[in-house]
Regions:
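Catalytic active-site module of serine/aspartate enzymes centered on a nucleophile-bearing elbow/loop
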Residues: 228-256
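Catalytic nucleophile-loop/oxyanion-hole region of alpha/beta-hydrolase
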Residues: 65-91, 96
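Short, surface-exposed "cap/lid" segments of acyl-processing enzymes
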Residues: 6-65
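Catalytic histidine neighborhood in serine/cysteine hydrolases
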Residues: 211, 215-233
Length: 256
């Protein structure tokens, strides 16, 4: 079923032009699988309040119905991010990419081929593999089962929703795993500084995702920050302020 009750105007691309000395610095924030811009927009608004130019796109197949996500090819997700990156380049000479969950995997994919255009990456509970599930297995499952129970809204803080789908499209999972397998093979090509936030208690993705990325990425400057009071969608959880402030410090440290 379609998403109901989401804030008006939030289930679409959002952007804001920066001001002052930070206006030339762009930040692109990408939501996760079955999620939507509401999971990243508060972060984007925080960074915009500090003068940065920000863009929070809606990935193809999201923000409408789960059935739409079953019709998307994985190449559409990095293509959307690259489009947004090019939009930022029109006014910004320094750009950071931020990704939550599959959004993290997507910005990593983009960084493997656009490394020189990116100043740094910030990842929150990024997805790079699905333990025990191969691309081939997910393909077979998707042929016989279109949907499964939702994996979204893994938030510790009561009364908070990420406004995502109430079901998991299995063909979409297959496409995501295809993208992530290719991304993982090329992680060594990513050499920009990386800040990675990881929830100690994550009911959606195992810690192996964080460990794989930190072990296989080509970046020498990589920092891991543990979140002890948030679940998977940490950008909306109790550690939100910690994420916001540390990301600001990371960006400021690379743009003196």
């Amino acid at each position: 079923m379609a998403i109901e009750g989401a804030p008006v105007g939030w289930m679409q691309d959002w952007s804001a032009v920066g001001s002052g000395k930070n206006a030339h610095i762009g930040v692109l924030l990408v939501h996760g699988f079955t999620g939507a811009p509401p999971s990243m927009r508060p972060w984007g608004e925080f960074l915009h309040s500090k003068g940065y130019t920000v863009r929070v796109p809606l990935l193809p197949g999201h923000g409408s119905t789960p059935e739409d996500l079953n019709e998307v090819k994985w190449q559409e997700w990095p293509a959307k991010v690259i489009h947004e990156l090019n939009e930022l380049k029109k006014t910004c000479d320094t750009i950071f990419l931020i990704g939550l969950s599959m959004g993290g995997g997507t910005v990593l994919n983009v960084a493997t081929t656009n490394n020189e255009e990116i100043k740094g990456l910030i990842l929150v509970n990024p997805w790079i593999h699905l333990k025990g599930v191969t691309v081939e297995v997910s393909f077979l499952v998707s042929r016989f089962r279109k949907m499964r129970a939702s994996v979204g809204n893994d938030i510790k803080r009561p009364g908070i929703t990420e406004w995502g789908y109430d079901a998991t499209p299995m063909r979409g999972v297959y496409q995501a795993l295809k993208m992530l397998r290719i991304t993982r093979k090329n992680l060594a090509a990513v050499t920009v500084p990386v800040q990675l936030f990881h929830s100690v208690e994550d009911h959606t993705l195992p810690v192996s995702n964080t460990e794989i990325i930190l072990a296989e990425i080509g970046s020498k400057d990589k920092t891991r920050i543990e979140l002890v009071n948030s679940y998977h969608v940490a950008t909306l959880d109790y550690d939100q302020e910690l994420i916001f402030q540390n990301s600001l410090t990371f960006i400021e440290g690379l743009t003196p």
